[in-house]
């Protein structure tokens, strides 16, 4: 009976994960396409990408204040109310949150518009970035409202509107970015960057309209709601509850975003310091700083692919664990968390090793006119492993009401990162690599703190041989095959074909190595959609032996 119940909840959890993975993959592909196109447009390049991302980082900082913590919080509170049948309470949580965060988003939108000149001139030391921030400012209020909708639907274990809206937003952003930047060819680079970011605002407004229409058609049915003690809370008390959970999450996310802002500000200033003895022109120094910022942005775009897949586990984990704990089902919560941690490692390890093995070929293939940054890419790929695992553990910590821990961990990491950035980037022999090195140290700190706390609350059942050593052996073996394969193929074919064939070779070899090492148990395979059919196929071809005993 317990096995059947777990299998049912596992299937529901994995269904949401698969929906989010498909959505996130499509979003990242679209994001890569438009960044690839605009980066290779004449007059844009790494410098244009630097202006583009510098303004976007400041925008992201305010965006985090107004919206980043909202989906997780609303999702958690709504799922807890629905789990006990209190649909009226769930609906009330949505309404209180919507009013407050709409107001907050509006205030921050106005603040960014009128404060952009000061930030660009006095903090970033690149005045022209102000244009990018101004065109992004109206988007903040619409993102805040959209975030409440997404949390509301996520709390109902309905990931469809979140997936569709995010995909729609990125599609519109992709089409409009390319269109607007092309329309500005011949103008100054910062104008082209501002035009590219203007598309983000248009896309977000249209996405909000979609979510609003969906909400009007799919509101919760409150006619059969069960009364709970929550009904006696005033709106002020309810808002206090929402903020009590959302503030630690927001602070954690804010510090993570600050990590990016630290890079933007310190790279912009420290690169100018590092090269001040080589270049005397202020304009030339700004161009060097923006080019370095562009390289970081370019690398972030690539490493975000595996992280987007992994984020699906983290996002689905919050309501899944909250629901299980609300029902006093610690076993299910533990299994979901353990599987998500293991799955994160299985997904991100081969990607990291593949990126390290093919760093320069990948950059040359995707950014033929701006292919610098292979070393930065390799260091970021190592950090990506820890980032992915920290994402999953953060979702678990939110689910077990330990939302302050990621904030504390990120805060400690951010302070150390800032100090390292100032020391390393200002050294002309290290320069931009300093940002990647400090990011790695930052992720190590966050990972260690989050893991220790989460494991003390929920037994994660991490087995060294099965969950760590076997995936590492498979990923390293794949990396060797990919590296050798690329170099052999490249003797006869060009870079693009050689890189694509090496990636295909890597994917096939990794799957075979995973099967050969028996990294996935029967229970792991059963968690995957169509797991029963996959396992039967593996048994039929004697890759796995039939296991008769029931699931634990």
PLM feature spans:
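N-terminal membrane topogenesis motif
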Residues: 1-33, 88, 92, 230-256, ...
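C-terminal transmembrane helix end/exit motif
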Residues: 1-2, 180-184, 202-231, 440-490, ...
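Membrane-proximal transmembrane or re-entrant/amphipathic helices at the cytosolic face
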Residues: 2, 272, 484-552
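Signature of the first transmembrane helix
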Residues: 11-72, 109, 113, 139-140, ...
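Helix-loop junctions and terminal segments of transmembrane helices
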Residues: 68-83, 299, 303-327, 337
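Interfacial segments at transmembrane-helix termini and the short loops linking adjacent helices
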Residues: 117-136, 290, 354-384
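Membrane-interface junctions at transmembrane-helix termini in multi-pass inner-membrane proteins
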Residues: 143-165, 382-412
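Membrane-interface helix-loop junctions in multi-pass transport and translocation proteins
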Residues: 160, 171-209, 404, 414-448, ...
